[in-house]
């Protein structure tokens, strides 16, 4: 097959000076194909889908944060120790120590979920702490609104948004100073 293609190409070359139609055909067959597609993955393609181990017993219709303490949270009757990510129908451990550890990587889960999260409520502990403006801008570009509050208000805001049936997630760091620790 390669030999017949080479013979056809040779015959086209011999006819090319006599016919303009064959000259354009010869050029299109002898030029290297132009590659216009990307060969390197984009940032979103680097993150592959993964499986998640869910911490709650039964998937409730809505996630509801019942209480919080310096140790963690009680969400739908399940005790969660340490920082956590609350997404529709799942509770995940969130690997941050303080608000200073919140970066694009630690929030990457929230913009990759399907269906897309409308609002992410971030609880930064005892006080409202400012996050890097580039992080907030990036999340806005991904279509996720971010509300940063102290953890007590973040829990209340999350519960309110969920009660309105909004597609909401929460990223919560337990506060260190709680007057009465219910856990």
UniProtKB/Swiss-Prot annotation:
* InterPro entries named in the record: MTH938-like_sf (IPR036748), NDUF3 (IPR034095), NDUFAF3/AAMDC (IPR007523)
Mind telling me which Pfam families this protein's record contains?
A: DUF498
Cellular component terms (Gene Ontology):
mitochondrial inner membrane; nucleus
Which keywords does UniProt give here?
A: Membrane, Mitochondrion, Mitochondrion inner membrane, Nucleus
Its subcellular locations are:
Nucleus; Mitochondrion inner membrane
Give the principal location in a single coarse category: nucleus
- Lineage, broadest ranks: Eukaryota, Metazoa, Chordata, Craniata, Vertebrata
Could you provide one GO biological process annotation from this protein's UniProt record? mitochondrial respiratory chain complex I assembly
Record-linked PANTHER family? NADH DEHYDROGENASE [UBIQUINONE] 1 ALPHA SUBCOMPLEX ASSEMBLY FACTOR 3, NUCLEAR PROTEIN E3-3
Positions the record marks as coiled coil are none
Task: Return the protein name.
Answer: NADH dehydrogenase [ubiquinone] 1 alpha subcomplex assembly factor 3
Q: Could you say which protein family the record assigns here?
A: Belongs to the NDUFAF3 family.
* General function of this protein: Essential factor for the assembly of mitochondrial NADH:ubiquinone oxidoreductase complex (complex I).
In its UniProt entry, the species of origin is given as Xenopus tropicalis (Western clawed frog)
């Amino acid at each position: 097959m390669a030999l017949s293609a080479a013979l056809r190409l040779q015959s086209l070359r011999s006819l090319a000076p006599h016919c303009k139609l064959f000259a354009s055909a010869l050029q299109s067959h002898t030029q290297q194909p132009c590659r216009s597609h990307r060969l390197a993955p984009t940032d979103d393609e680097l993150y592959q889908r993964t499986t998640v181990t869910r911490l709650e017993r039964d998937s409730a219709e809505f996630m509801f944060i019942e209480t919080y303490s310096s140790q963690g949270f009680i969400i739908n009757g399940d005790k969660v120790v340490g920082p956590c990510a609350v997404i529709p129908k799942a509770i995940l451990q969130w690997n941050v120590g303080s608000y200073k550890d919140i970066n694009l990587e630690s929030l990457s889960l929230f913009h990759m979920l399907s269906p897309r999260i409308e609002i992410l409520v971030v609880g930064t502990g005892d006080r409202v702490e400012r996050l890097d403006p580039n992080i907030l801008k990036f999340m806005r570009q991904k279509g996720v609104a971010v509300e940063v509050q102290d953890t007590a208000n973040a829990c209340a805001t999350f519960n309110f948004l969920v009660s309105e049936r909004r597609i909401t997630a929460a990223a919560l760091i337990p506060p260190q100073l709680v007057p009465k620790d219910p856990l």
